[in-house]
Amino acid sequence: MRFLTFIIFSFIFFSIIHSQDSKKISEKYFPDFDIEVPTPAFNKKKGFTKYSEMMNFLNELCEKYPNKVSYKYIGKSQKDKQIPIVYLGENKVDNFKVCFMGGLHGNEPASTESLLLLIHNLLEVDSLKDLTSKLNIAIIPMANIDGYEKQSRYASNGQDLNRDHTKLTNQETIAIKQSISDFSPDLMVDFHEYKPYRVDFVNFGEYGTTSMYDCMFLYSGNLNVCPRIKSIVENTYLPPAKLKLDNKGLRYHNYLSSKHKNNKIYFNLGSVSPRSSATSFALGNSISMLMEIRGVGLNRTSFKRRIYTSYLLAYSFLNTSVGNSNHIKSTLEDCNKFPEEITIKYKKEKSNYNLDM
């Protein structure tokens, strides 16, 4: 009986971890957008853009627009693949600087595809071209190449690169941190995808439940981050981004995660850990965010929807940066004086919270 129970539980666990939206769910709640995505992934019926395809894609754009886009290699992956960072803009000294990153977790393909779409459109679409004259933009479209090539969250040594921003034990993380530090962005956004089906949700409702949010916003609550950085995120960047999402019928929420403890499920809002990018770059005095798009485990289900969600957010952040550059820069200068004291211990608060699923 125990063995049978274990088999049943294992089957449920495996099904939840690897489940995708049914056709009925995706068509009703997460329909794809009818948009053109000119990235290599859409030249084939399955799979995602491979590293070699991405480099061909970037090389074609660099040949076509030699004065508007370039890239350089910032280091190598553990399997000896060169990691590119793409630069767009006129590189004016006084321009506001924006850095975007995707593919730090290799099984989150919409992050890379959306940034390739953004690079393409910044060069090809008239309504976006003006942004590159007002901003200096750096984009790392595929940060974890080895993981991405096999659609694994982890680097080839099994480590999570988004838990390595303090110890810097992986060569990819060292290269990424150094290149972003050299660029010194005013705004840093790391694009990810999250898993909508979780074991924690199995007992919710009659058939279990899934997360309904197309995207979640993560920005640091670390007490050593200048509070005005958090204020800029909440009051300057997110309102216009939410408006763009509302206009497309996309759902959003601040980032939350769940865990089991004492036979109860607890939800955590936000994050404070300097091991991950959102807090790490905020501690470096950049406006820092991490975008979580609903997508891990969905393969190419609602893929254009996921890509377009990331793309809309990136586009919104660029426009907001142009319109508020002086205010944001002066805020970051003021934040150089913070903190006078360093917090080394904190305690989480527990509170009642209504969550739609």
Name each region found by the language model.
Residues 78-104:
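Acidic/His- and Gly-rich active-site-bordering loop/insert found
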Residues 1-22:
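Bacterial Sec-dependent N-terminal signal peptides
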Residues 71, 85, 139, 188, ...:
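Conserved beta-strand scaffold positions in the cores of enzyme catalytic domains, especially
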Residues 61-64, 121, 179, 244, ...:
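Generic, well-ordered alpha-helical scaffold segments in large soluble proteins
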Residues 21-82:
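Short glycine- and acidic-rich boundary segments immediately preceding or forming the N-terminal edge
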Residues 94-104, 109-267, 272:
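Active-site/substrate-binding loop(s) of hydrolase catalytic cores
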Residues 257-357:
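Hard-cation-handling environments
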Residues 18-39, 204-218, 284-290:
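Short, compositionally biased low-complexity segments
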